[in-house]
Amino acid sequence: MGMTAKRSSRTSGSVAMDDYLEQILHLIEQKGYARPVDISKNLGLSQASVTNMLQRLHTEGLVNHEKYRGTVLTEHGRSIARAITDRHETLTRFLRFFDIAEDTIYHDVEGMEHHVSKATLNAIQAVVKVLESEPEFLARIKRTLGEQA
């Protein structure tokens, strides 16, 4: 997962910070804690880079470091991380309707999740609800996609 520092007005302030917050939340939910070594491994970055970003996230009031517990999200950090995760899940659910390969979905969502506006996300959520409740409509879309292939 590439780390760029492009600004994102919708979340923490940068794509890289979003990725860290999302990863920290994932680790906490999975293991009960988020250690820098685990963050480093999962993001494919050096521990020095992770330490620097954790200091930045701490300065922004998004994380704290607790002895024996590792990195924990502040209430504000958890709120942002949850919004990022929810956005990721909505985009993933939407693309799965169209039988797109999982690795393609993953890479597409990683790019889109940082830049999608709230208005666009709301529209996608509405479409997801319709596709879930109207399978015949989804079948029509899939037929149309098949004709375009």
Regions found by a protein language model. Give the residues of each.
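Short, Lys/Arg-enriched N-terminal segment that forms or immediately precedes the first helix
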Residues: 1-12
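N-terminal helix-turn-helix DNA-binding core of bacterial DNA-binding proteins
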Residues: 11-45
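N-terminal positioning helix adjacent to the helix-turn-helix/winged-helix DNA-binding module
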Residues: 16-19, 35, 76, 87, ...
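Canonical helix-turn-helix DNA-binding module
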Residues: 36-67, 75
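Helix N-cap / loop-to-helix initiation motif
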Residues: 46, 99-103
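Basic, amphipathic "hinge/linker" alpha-helix immediately C-terminal to the N-terminal HTH DNA-binding motif
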Residues: 69-88
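C-terminal regulatory/oligomerization modules of transcriptional regulators
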Residues: 110-149
